[in-house]
Amino acid sequence: MRRSLSLAILSQVPRSLVEVVVSWNLPMHRWLKVYVFKQSRSRLGPGAAVMLTYLASTVLHGLTGQIAAVLFSLGAYTWVEHSLRAKLSNIMDASIGARREAEPRKRVGSITDHLMKTVNIILMSQHREGSSWVILVNLVFGLVTMFHLAYLGVMFDQSSPDQATGYSWAHTMSKWRDLDYTSHWAMGILATVNWLL
């Protein structure tokens, strides 16, 4: 059985930053998930485990200011995006999570959940992958993802001789300052919405 190193289409036309991070380098993702994330999640909690995983990834990719800034930004971005989309998916009972669902979700619990399930049975076609509003929401999140990737990708200027060894932290911050930290502000807004939900 041949295993892929990456799933290029999911990196080039992404649904979410989570999907990009997972599909960019499958062997490294599997290793980091098994040996860093899962090992630390029970002791530190999911948020700290995500950041520890990105720290390990930074070390494996070469500890430069440029790589560290981009990967730690990705860590924060993916955590916020995953959390926000999970909350929205649960509230709307829709397939708008950061990763595609293998099968429809099953809701259990209180009478309110039972009533929501009844309403959702009536409106089921509106909540699945193929419905127009779910496609629209996922498309908007996909466009936001492409914006973040372009912003983070500005750090990797192939025309400079310094790129081979990696830029310093100060250089990376000056590039982002020139862009008014636009992507970081956008993620801050999403983090606030996530916190309010």
Region spans (language model):
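Non-catalytic, membrane-anchoring transmembrane segments at the edges
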Residues: M1-L197
